């Protein structure tokens, strides 16, 4: 305790009652939230491995591509031990582009909307491209954190309305709350979304959910086996089923799942195959699987890129074309890159592959 080996110092332990009940009968889920000494055996890694703060023109906003990402909250209802934002959740100080050291700040509506308005006006007056950055119109925003779904409905509504008013065409909400606390997607929240859509029907709304393993949403019997209905289809646990149906039943909302491939959690082709098939069956898309990032203590969680690619490739055998949409992505300083193949042979024309 109170040393570099303190796992609580690296990332506080936190979970919901709903998730605790699932974890009691699932080793993979236990690995998601249970702290172990392995996390601090090797503290190699970076607090900001993608140098994201180099792309932060306004506090709380990352503007690296045509899409912007906003930190709207610094907490979640439970904590994944492998969290890519552990520096934000733990409120740690990181080095910024100007050499200063400070905690990441949260986005604020006046500053964010002023930046978007100014950027898009400059782009519009210069033939559709910003003269300094080369970026096009900022048309899509991802609400992130932390988990935006821990915010009150009124705060989420305020962000949605402010972004719509400033001309954002598509809004994503990144959340793991459907796994941690699916009861959050109640009728009051869904009614708020309905009102938003009635007011701004032209604005797209996408929920980027974070299921890592099918145990997070599928129902199990007392022996730990998945439960099938009379047609042989795997049944969801009631709370997750209700939450997912609440979103996908609204045709104007898209739901897409993305997940890293993490050691002892989902580096299992059978588990990923079940998850991809079950999600697509209920109307959610399989978006990305990610290779682990070099966060602090990453060696306790990451698998080699070759392993991640092999697991995903094997998992998609037997899936239909629409079930197997997910790609493997690796994130580095310049951006996301798809891992399309792995080879031990030299690649013609690629220097250094010999």
Put a short name on every predicted segment:
Residues 15, 55-86:
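N-terminal pre-triad scaffold of radical SAM enzymes
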Residues 1-24, 273-354:
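Auxiliary Fe-S-binding modules of radical SAM enzymes
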Residues 109-138, 146-307, 311-318:
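Conserved AdoMet/S-adenosylmethionine-binding subsite of the radical SAM
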Residues 50, 59, 76-86, 115-122, ...:
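A short mid-domain helix/strand-loop element embedded in enzyme catalytic domains
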Residues 94-113:
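Short cysteine/histidine-rich metal-coordination sites, predominantly Zn2+-binding motifs
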Residues 1-64:
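Flexible, acidic/Gly-rich N-terminal and inter-domain linker regions that tether
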Residues 83-98:
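Iron-sulfur (Fe-S) cluster-binding segments and ferredoxin-like electron-carrier domains
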């Amino acid at each position: 305790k109170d040393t570099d080996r303190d796992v609580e110092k690296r990332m506080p332990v936190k979970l919901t009652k709903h998730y605790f009940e699932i974890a009691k009968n699932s080793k993979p889920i236990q690995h998601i939230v249970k702290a172990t000494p392995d996390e601090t055996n090797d503290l190699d890694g970076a607090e900001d491995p993608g140098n994201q703060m180099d792309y932060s023109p306004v506090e709380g906003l990352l503007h690296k591509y045509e899409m912007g990402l906003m930190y709207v909250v610094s907490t979640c209802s439970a904590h994944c031990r492998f969290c890519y934002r552990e520096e934000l959740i733990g409120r740690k100080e990181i080095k910024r582009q100007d050499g200063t050291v400070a905690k990441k700040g949260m986005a604020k509506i006046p500053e964010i909307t002023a930046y978007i308005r100014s950027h898009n006006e400059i782009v519009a007056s210069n033939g559709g491209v910003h003269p300094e950055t080369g970026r096009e119109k900022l048309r899509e925003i991802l609400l992130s954190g932390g988990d935006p779904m821990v915010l009150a409905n009124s705060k989420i509504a305020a962000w949605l309305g402010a972004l719509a008013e400033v001309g954002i065409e598509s809004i994503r909400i990144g959340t793991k709350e459907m796994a941690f606390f699916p009861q959050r997607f109640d009728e009051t929240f869904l009614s708020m979304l309905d009102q938003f859509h009635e007011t701004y029907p032209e604005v797209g709304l996408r929920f980027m959910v974070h299921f890592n393993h099918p145990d997070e949403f599928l129902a199990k019997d007392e022996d730990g086996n998945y439960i099938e209905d009379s047609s042989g289809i795997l049944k969801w646990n009631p709370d997750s089923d209700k939450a997912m149906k609440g979103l996908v039943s609204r045709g104007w909302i898209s739901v897409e799942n993305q997940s890293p491939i993490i050691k002892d959690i989902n580096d299992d082709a059978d588990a990923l195959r079940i998850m991809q098939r079950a999600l697509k069956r209920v109307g959610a898309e399989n978006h990305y699987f990610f290779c682990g990032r070099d966060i602090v203590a990453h060696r306790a969680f990451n698998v080699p890129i070759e392993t991640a690619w092999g697991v995903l490739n094997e998992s998609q055998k037997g899936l239909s074309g629409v079930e197997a949409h997910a790609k493997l992505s690796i994130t580095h300083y310049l951006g996301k890159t798809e891992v399309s193949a792995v080879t031990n042979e030299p690649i013609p024309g690629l220097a250094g592959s010999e």
